[in-house]
Amino acid sequence: MDTDLNAIKKVNTRNNLIFIADVVLFFILLNTLPFTPEANKSLALLVFIAILWLTEALHVTVTALLVPILGILLGLVKSKEALAAFADPTIFLFFGGFALATALHIQNLDRLIANKIMAMSYGKLSVAAIYLFAVTAFLSMWMSNTATAAMMLPLAMGILSKLDPKRDHNTYVFVLLGIAYSASIGGMGTLVGSPPNGIVATQLGISFAEWMKYGLPIMLILMPLMIGVLYVVFRPKFDLQFEQSFEKIDLTPTRILTLIIFALTATGWIFSSKINPALSSLLGLQSKIASFDTIIALIATAVICITRIATWKQIQEGTEWGVLFLFGGGLTLSAILGNTGASKIMADGIVAFIEGGHYYIIGLIVATFIIFLTEFTSNTASAALLVPIFISIAEALNIQSLGLALIIGLGASCAFMLPVATPPNAIVFGTGMLKQTEMVKAGFWLNIICVFVIGTIGYLFWF
């Protein structure tokens, strides 16, 4: 107990010192930067928020709330404009995603899907491991990566319990890391799969279906590469048949209705570009429905409550409100930097160093930067901070802003080396069945592969 208290005191002392130093630096920059008064204020605010986000001296959500507060007090943005970002359509799209995930979880459909697919392995450990990874990735496309990893872990441990933890240690590590990494990679596949995706989509006006054109191929490429890396590094043994004993979950009318709502929602998101004009014409509207993906999400949320599939309280508890506030803070900061010219000042400064470099090399450098940065920082906070800056850099370099933004957004989900990097990493590390050095060994090579995959595809198709 005393050890825990001492550790908490040390963390609090560290965070307090960082916060005080950050405040001092804020006022120094405010009075010494050589640009226009508005740009000086914006850049000082950016540095202040960036330090808090990257060090997590304050909770990232609290820091996000400081953005509109300080922006208003510094005269950089009006109250209505600052708070409007917290009602951005993408925030409500993610809220609908949380509601849908809650419905699947409350009705035990996530477990039902997992059990049905695992039953197809017929007791073969190698097949079961691949199915575990595939189901984890699929569910992470629609649910929180954290919730998916937490749900799949007991299923994996039940299968691994037939093995000897010492003799078959490498097989344990292979399966556990595969679940964590599949959760992160799966989150790249859809717009609602991971918060950084939504940040990029909001900045560039990308729809759900458009995001899948970029994120899904990356996901499908990285999944087999991830499995290959884990196999080469750990050489697991699969010479075992295991008995299948999954909990019985009946397909009740309520669960069938939930699956129908899920299927209709996913279909609406994927084919929104065709459904929207047809529906608008049918309703006699003059133009297409704006933010159609978000409207679909809100309809799904309402139907889930109306049909009693999940209660409002359950949806409240299943929603990561901090993530939604972080979205709002990031969008407000982006607007402030753009309106005051601070983004252009930073972009011009960075461009001065990299101008003339080959676009492929620039893409690799950006991918390396974001992937290794998010080993130590929140991927959502990093994306909220960096996406608008790199959009400005792309514009200054006269290349597609889509390219660098996607590299940042997708690269932010590729933190595989450390337990603290992502919640799925922490969840499997918490089993005590693997060492940090083992995660670092596999994660480092997977990080490098992600750098080249994302950087190369970015150069060939996004720039």
How would you label these PLM feature ranges?
Residues 115, 119-131, 162-177, 208-215, ...:
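Membrane-interface alpha-helices at helix entry/exit sites of multi-pass transporters
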Residues 98, 136-153, 170-206, 223-231, ...:
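Alpha-helical transmembrane segments and, especially, the helix-loop junctions at the ends
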Residues 62, 66-166, 316-397:
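Membrane-embedded alpha-helical segments and adjacent helix-loop junctions characteristic
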Residues 70-71, 201-209, 433-436:
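Interfacial segments of multi-pass membrane proteins
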Residues 1-93, 210-348, 446-447, 451, ...:
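Hydrophobic transmembrane alpha-helices of multi-pass small-molecule transporters
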